């Protein structure tokens, strides 16, 4: 098997040291790891073979900067470490492919569904997979109707923005506890 060079972004993420260890100790081939992060001193900086400080994934030149790093380091596979960059990467899929880099991401439609909680719930429900009860909200009136539909104020209601990652945008509205 040929040796590989893998680029891993978000080198300061808690899971990245374990992922790097898996790449390095894979038992099949030599894997050279290039790390990038928007912090100058991410936790995995000294575990990687090369490191680059990059702007946030939302920066307009982010993909161009990563393309340059991939060319310079002869990257074979780009393994995104943070979901914030995936949407931008899939839009530049062909640019990475053109320089021989495989993006370790799903196609743009799958990314769109996975990054949108409402679309995910709708797709799962259409496939017959049980999902929690939900009510899509787009306006203040939708919000009021949705709260009533979900049983508020007798029952607490959980809100989640459709495009937030992790626990961003999660709110619990409980008439017995909420001051708002």
Write out the residue ranges for each language-model feature.
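ATP-binding N-terminal substructure of ATP-dependent carboxylate-amine bond-forming enzymes
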Residues: 1-105, 141
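Mixed-charge, polar/low-complexity N-terminal
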Residues: 27, 32-33, 110, 116-118
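Histidine-centered beta-alpha loop that forms part of the nucleotide-sugar donor binding/catalytic region
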Residues: 83, 108, 162
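A short, histidine- and acid-enriched strand-loop-helix "catalytic/donor-clamping" loop
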Residues: 105-111
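Active-site nucleotide/adenylate-binding loops and adjacent lid/helix of ATP-dependent enzymes
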Residues: 111-180
């Amino acid at each position: 098997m040929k040796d590989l060079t893998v680029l891993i972004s978000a080198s300061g993420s808690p899971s990245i040291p374990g992922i790097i260890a898996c790449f390095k100790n894979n038992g099949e081939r030599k894997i050279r790891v290039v790390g990038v992060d928007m912090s100058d001193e991410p936790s995995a900086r000294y575990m990687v073979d090369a490191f680059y400080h990059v702007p946030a994934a939302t920066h307009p030149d982010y993909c161009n900067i990563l393309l340059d790093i991939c060319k310079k380091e002869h990257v074979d596979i780009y393994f995104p470490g943070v979901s914030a960059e995936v949407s931008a990467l899939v839009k530049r899929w062909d640019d990475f492919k053109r320089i021989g880099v495989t993006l370790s991401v799903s196609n743009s439609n799958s990314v769109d569904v996975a990054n949108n909680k409402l679309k995910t719930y709708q797709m799962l429900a259409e496939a017959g997979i049980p999902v929690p009860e939900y009510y899509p909200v787009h306006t203040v009136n939708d919000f009021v109707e949705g709260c009533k539909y979900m049983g508020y104020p007798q029952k607490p209601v959980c809100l989640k923005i459709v495009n937030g990652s992790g626990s961003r945008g999660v709110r619990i509205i409980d008439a017995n506890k909420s001051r708002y």
